[in-house]
Amino acid sequence: MKVGVALSGGVDSAVALYLLLKEGHEVKAFHMKTKEDEFFLKKEIKKKVCCSPSDTADAIRIARSLGVEIEIVDVREVFREKVIEPFKRDLLRGLTPNPCVHCNRYVKFGYFMDYVLSQGFDAFASGHYARVEFSGKYGKKVIKKGVDGKKDQSYFLARIEPWRIEKLLFPNGIYTKEEIRRIAEEAGIHVAKKQESQDVCFIPDGSIENFLKDEGITLSEGKVITEKGEVVGHHRGYPLYTVGQRKGLKIEKFGERLYVREKIPESNVVVVSGLEGVFFSGLIAVDPVWHVDLPEEFRCVCRVRKKAEEAPAIVRVKNSEVEVRFEKKIFAVTPGQIAAFYDEDTLLGGAIIKEGIP
């Protein structure tokens, strides 16, 4: 089979490439450039991020060491249009967006995958910790969780278009991270011990405030109020806060621990409450993407953040809106984040959280 492999320059995609070669596939590596090299060089990078100049150099070295052709693909324009600009707009709307999910849908498993397949490849592969398997229950190929529960990345694939699943290969999904590193070492791949990417690639210093400043947006301080309207402190700019957050709030008076419950951009206000106020019995989500056919009402488990515990729920679908009711209240349902739905280890799809239901 002819397989185009997304090679980031990290150990995961390097091993995916290596495994596909061992299986006898005809492979070519493709590397995405999402930002100009100068962007990374002038930033104070606190943690390892993807798509940097050093990643490009590593990707080229990996491909050469394995005897594979590599092509650098410029996705900067579509990345800004589909990821950076919506991220910025959502922050100013008071949301907490997940740019990695949007990148996967529109760029990596969108524009980039389309480009690779247009070159005559039968499949598109990446180093994601997830699996693609045929489901007898749903009668088609589905995405399943990776066997390494700590590294499972299926959540970030919740909104890719369902037709693409037939064309996907995730060789790493049956391995743990430790096994992947061991395979890399045994194969002599030089990035076997390379640090994992941590922050959003276009915010390499981890600062939302600096990102907005670079985009020409100056934040204004505002009031922190309780649900009853009592002013208890001030914030540095509402886009810097998210539902459930406690640290970073300038609370000047109050007896109990307070958490962000809501942001009101129109009045530049952050609303806080006690812990009970940031637990929700359900949520409303919009713009769902379903990987399988489902009834209007079904039971499943729902994850509202990458590291959130999965919550059993009843889901009701009405056109482009999804109502989710949990068996018991969960912490910090955050507008802008993704609600991913699972049937055991099968990913059913995902939707964008509009609001939490108290």
Curated annotation (Swiss-Prot):
Cystines in this chain: 103-201
Cross-referenced InterPro entries: MnmA-like, MnmA-like_C, MnmA-like_central, MnmA-like_central_sf, Rossmann-like_a/b/a_fold
Keywords attached to this entry: ATP-binding, Cytoplasm, Disulfide bond, Nucleotide-binding, RNA-binding, Transferase, tRNA processing, tRNA-binding
Catalytic activity: S-sulfanyl-L-cysteinyl-[protein] + uridine(34) in tRNA + AH2 + ATP = 2-thiouridine(34) in tRNA + L-cysteinyl-[protein] + A + AMP + diphosphate + H(+)
Broadest EC class assigned to this enzyme: transferase
Binding locations of ATP: 6-13, 32, 127
Example GO biological process: tRNA wobble position uridine thiolation
Region feature Interaction with tRNA, mapped onto this chain: 151-153
Residues of the site described as Interaction with tRNA: 128, 337
Keyword Signal: no
GO MF annotation, one: ATP binding
Enzyme Commission designation: 2.8.1.13
Compartment annotation: Cytoplasm
GO cellular component: cytoplasm
Catalytic residues (UniProt): 103 (nucleophile), 201 (cysteine persulfide intermediate)
Main location: cytoplasm
Role of this protein: Catalyzes the 2-thiolation of uridine at the wobble position (U34) of tRNA, leading to the formation of s(2)U34.
Family the entry assigns: Belongs to the MnmA/TRMU family.
Identification of the protein by name: tRNA-specific 2-thiouridylase MnmA
Organism of derivation: Thermotoga neapolitana (strain ATCC 49049 / DSM 4359 / NBRC 107923 / NS-E)
